[in-house]
Design a protein with these regions (language model features):
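Flexible, glycine/charged-enriched surface loops at secondary-structure junctions
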Residues: 27-33, 184-193, 218-238, 331-339, ...
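N-terminal glycine-rich phosphate/adenylate-binding segment common to multiple enzyme folds
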Residues: 43-146, 159, 264-268
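Single conserved hydrophobic/aromatic residue that forms the stacking wall/gate
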Residues: 1-5, 10
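Glycine-rich phosphate/nucleotide-binding loop
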Residues: 41-44, 246-350
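Active-site pocket-lining segments that scaffold enzyme catalytic pockets across diverse folds
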Residues: 164-218, 238, 242
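Glycine-rich phosphate-binding loop
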Residues: 56-73, 216-292, 378
Length: 381
């Protein structure tokens, strides 16, 4: 398994938990051979390259990996390393399972109502990186072309970005979400979009989703329009405007099982949902190509450099991303041990500083001691 180095020690803490879960689950009959590959600050310091070609080559060769939070310099023309990894490996589905762990303080009244799998398209939309800088020769030329060919008037002092949404990318993302819903006995899937405004991009995403339901999933799924909200034993598929969704998922999250959405909407929605369950510190993520099997699982938060070297950062997101990785590999027994250990530590209040906030019954642990508590839980199960 490829392991991308993090700027924080949470990587080592997480690896300790992963190895313990595998040892417990399979009685030394299985083992992970870890291989470190570089990206982010460590790669730049050692190789003068934020994302070396060898890192992508190793992920491509071995097909699965897990990644800690990485630093990308703001500005300066350097693209997000996370986005670059996803696009270079064509990891088209960003999958975010969102659930609450009993004992975690949240701002909502019923965090336990959140049990949602969010599928976010990972390769297109405004994240495709097709942008032109204000006052550049390229943006002036494009402005001139758009005015002459389409009559579009765009202010001359504008930067311009392109928002591609393709049928190919939309269908494979929604197909992955539908397959997940089928395999996990989910009752509904919501296509979240802004097609009321962007009719030929996000509106097309919605339309292609409904077409896919009819053409490939009609035996197991049905649209709201075709059943008037009464799907019988099939998965109910409906669409929700993105801004309305952000309201509805706060008021009635129990009505949503699986979400399929575009890249930018998914970025907003996944972090908003994470806030409902206690924050991104316990929110895992995976970037997956279900067609060729390649995947990179990752912590969903940033590097928090102000806590570097303090043994303070919460490794929960990366550890739970490892649980996702195990389940994707078919190592469900190891995954179950990780989940049970996490549930026990959190419910007993043995947590890192961020999860201790607002709790009177919590014992604040360092990052390493939190990992040790998880290992002890695994060994006692």
């Amino acid at each position: 398994v490829g392991l991308v180095g993090s700027e924080m020690c949470i990587r080592d803490r997480s690896q300790l938990v992963f190895d313990s879960a595998v040892k417990k689950a399979y009685n030394n009959q299985r083992k992970i051979n870890w291989m470190e590959v570089l990206a982010g600050q460590k790669a730049f310091d050692q190789q003068n390259d934020w994302l070396p070609d060898n890192t992508i080559e190793m992920f491509d060769k071995y097909g699965i990996g897990i990644k800690g939070p990485l630093t990308t310099p703001v500005g300066g023309g350097i693209r997000s390393i996370n986005v670059s990894i996803r696009q270079k490996l064509d990891l088209y589905a960003c999958v975010r399972p969102l659930r609450w762990f009993r004992g975690v303080e949240t701002p909502t009244k019923r965090p336990g109502d959140v049990d949602i799998a969010l599928f976010r398209e990972n390769t297109e939309d405004v994240y495709s990186g097709k942008e032109l800088e204000v006052n550049s020769d390229e943006v002036l030329a494009l402005n001139k072309f758009l005015k002459s060919e389409f009559g579009w008037e765009i202010r001359e002092d504008s930067g311009i970005g392109i928002k591609p949404i393709s049928k190919t990318a939309s269908e494979r993302l929604i197909r992955a979400a539908l397959n997940f819903a089928v395999e996990n006995d989910k009752k509904n899937l919501a296509i979240v979009h802004k097609g009321n405004i962007m009719k030929f991009t996000e509106g097309a995403f919605r339309g292609w989703g409904y077409d896919l339901v009819k053409n490939e999933f009609s035996d197991v799924a049905i649209s709201w329009q075709d059943c008037n909200g009464e799907p019988g034993n099939k998965i109910l598929v409906q669409d929700v405007i993105a801004d309305a969704f952000l309201q509805q998922v706060l008021i009635k999250p129990h009505e949503f099982d699986v979400i399929a959405t575009t890249n930018l909407n998914g970025d907003y929605a996944s972090d908003a949902l994470a806030a409902q369950i206690g924050g991104i510190g316990i929110s895992p993520g995976g970037n997956i190509n279900y067609e060729n099997g390649k995947s990179v699982f990752e912590a969903t938060h940033g590097t928090a450099p102000k806590y570097a070297g303090q043994d303070k950062a919460n490794p929960g997101s990366l550890i739970l991303s490892g649980e996702m990785m195990f389940r994707y590999m078919g190592w469900n027994e190891a995954a179950d041990f990780v989940i049970k250990a996490m549930e026990k530590s959190i419910s007993e209040g043995n947590v890192t500083y961020d999860l201790a906030r607002g709790r009177t019954d919590a014992t604040t642990l360092s990052s390493s001691d939190f990992a040790k508590s998880l290992v002890e839980n695994i060994e006692s199960l």
